[in-house]
Amino acid sequence: MAKRSLGIGKASKAKKQKSAPREEEKIEKDQATEGSNEITVELNEEADANDEIAQLKALWKTYNDSEKDNELVINGIIHECDRLLRNSKLGEEKEKEKEQYTQELPDFFHSIYALALAELAKFHTEDNKKVAEYFDAAVERADLGLSQHQDSIQLLFSKSKILLHQIALQYISQLKVDTSISKKVPKLSSYLDSALRTYEEAEKKADELKKYELFNADQLEILQVLDDLLDIVDNFGKDIAEGEDDDDEVEDDEIELEESHPLYAIRESDEYNQWWRDHIILFLDNVDKHGKEIKVDFKEKAKSQEEEHPLLPLRREICKRIGQSYLQEAEVPSSVFTTLAYDDGFKNEKEINGLSLKESQKIAQKLISTALKYLQWAEDQEEPETWVNVAEAMISLGNLYEVESEEQESHYQEAEKILNKANNVTNGKYEDVLENLLGD
């Protein structure tokens, strides 16, 4: 597809205001001093050259689909948003004089503006004051947009993403292991609850209005941000401990937090991990509702990428993440079963972590079987790695049955077929995995 260049930011300089500027106006001034406002970005032809809002939307998509590592582009987007906002206000004043004002910036304008402001914080993590300013401005812009578009699902999704990023970049980044909750340091579980309530509000409205097309890759990113945030909380303090202790054991040991720590309530509760699981499964259901003709039987493979339902790549990505989450949950009961069944050092033990041999086996088998289902749905005929994910899950499931039992051999044999196929098309990339299975 042919592309063209777009120059933006030529008219972004604003007149000085007598009243105190809002956060986003102060940011506009700061960014104007950091370099030329002239930016050239290639856009797809679908952007109407005469529609500035459409151009902004296309520019944001260009950035959003990139590596997101270009601060200059983000500055340009913010300058353009500011210019469009000022022009809109000027037009509003003129039209109001004629009592004919009907112009209103669309909800996605406010969404782009807010997300761009939050994105800018990622480039200034060394200056927490700036980070706070960017996030305050981002939340303010989202709220202003919602005041004009009260039923905007997109703005609610965007706000929830901003709030999640804010927790990590503005707050967690400043914490230490011995930090305690105070007037200046909030209990972060309440902030996380607020972000998740905002997401749930968007999710509920989308379902009520049957706007299932909104459950796309952009919104899936919100759940990824949450997953990353929970991982940060789980591993909080390990990097500090590793710097102070030369022992490798630190990597596997969780750093204890006092009840007064801002992250304590998040780490000690499993409700947030369960929330993620529940809502990504619901996300998958909504994707399926949008793509009514989508194939969900892993055995029904399209003959080529061109014949695929357009939502299948998204669906595969969701299923992969769900499958991986079940595998992760299965790690503890699987380890308990293996230890009680095969470790002579525990032959007199009846339980580990409150689980007996039979209980741990049953729980792990159920979790890995569920994981296997989703990983099979995540298989891509063009990506051998997705086949190997299935094979490895089959091996893990086989390990939970009696040695040389019919069930174990069945899972191993199926895994071997898959690994041989993957190994052949990748010129031996998975030879080690295959040899490990065969015991060579």
Curated annotation (Swiss-Prot):
Residues 1-37 are annotated as: Disordered. The keyword Transcription regulation applies. Residues 20-32 have a biased composition (Basic and acidic residues). InterPro entries: Nro1/ETT1. One of its GO terms (biological process) is positive regulation of SREBP signaling pathway. Keywords: Nucleus, Transcription, Transcription regulation, Translation regulation. Its main location: nucleus. It is found in: Nucleus. It comes from the Eukaryota. One of its GO terms (cellular component) is nucleus. PANTHER family: ENHANCER OF TRANSLATION TERMINATION 1. Belongs to the ETT1 family. Required for correct translation termination and probably involved in regulation of hypoxic gene expression. This is Enhancer of translation termination 1. The lineage of its organism: Eukaryota, Fungi, Dikarya, Ascomycota, Saccharomycotina. The gene is ETT1.
